Amino acid sequence: MSIKLTATTRTDLGKGASRRLRHADLVPAIVYGADKEAVSLTFTHKDIIKAEGIEAFYSSVLDLEIDGVSEQVVLKDLQRHAFKARIQHLDLLRVDAKHKLHTTVPLHFINEGLSEAIKNGGIVYRTINEVEVLCLPKDLPSFIEVDISTMEIGDTLHLSNITLPAGVESVELNKGEEHDLPMVSIALSKKAPAEEIEAETAE
């Protein structure tokens, strides 16, 4: 799914200018990278709210149009108001098709409904919900699936247990085996009947 953002350049900079933009229901932003000059931008708040409601907004290459000129970017930072439902600022990074990106991708834990361990009283404990990856822009996945259907009570899946898409590397695993982080585990519910606990122990 391609997400398109439309922005205009701005020359009125500083805290006062940003405050005025926010009062006008606009979002100040900046785009930088790819050996090009950083450019200050303005988005409409409603457009950003609509885009950020899509999970892929945070982990996909975005199509950015600035004053009619298009380029590709990824989201590097999004600042929210401390207590209001408002977005304060965006940082966007230009992508170079020939250079690898270091970014985060969400994990989707699938097939809980097929898990016998869960049916027998197991509880799923997720340790992490996203993973750092290194890949070319064309290979960047919107998410990575983790199938837990065959897990048994007491099992833990680590980063090394998932199959990454072609061209995608795990930043943590590249550091060595000691960085093979646990992602998800299944433990027996404390509310499970005593006979189920005994059955699991016997197995």
Curated annotation (Swiss-Prot):
Pfam families given in the database record: Ribosomal_L25p, Ribosomal_TL5_C
Taxonomic superkingdom: Bacteria
UniProt entry keywords in alphabetical sequence: Ribonucleoprotein, Ribosomal protein, RNA-binding, rRNA-binding
Keyword rRNA-binding (UniProt): yes
CDD domains, sorted: Ribosomal_L25_TL5_CTC
One Gene Ontology cellular component: cytosolic large ribosomal subunit
Subunit (UniProt): Part of the 50S ribosomal subunit; part of the 5S rRNA/L5/L18/L25 subcomplex. Contacts the 5S rRNA. Binds to the 5S rRNA independently of L5 and L18.
Family under the similarity heading: Belongs to the bacterial ribosomal protein bL25 family. CTC subfamily.
HAMAP family: Ribosomal_bL25, Ribosomal_bL25_CTC
Name this protein carries in UniProt: Large ribosomal subunit protein bL25
Species whose genome carries this gene: Psychromonas ingrahamii (strain DSM 17664 / CCUG 51855 / 37)
Organism lineage string: Bacteria, Pseudomonadati, Pseudomonadota, Gammaproteobacteria, Alteromonadales
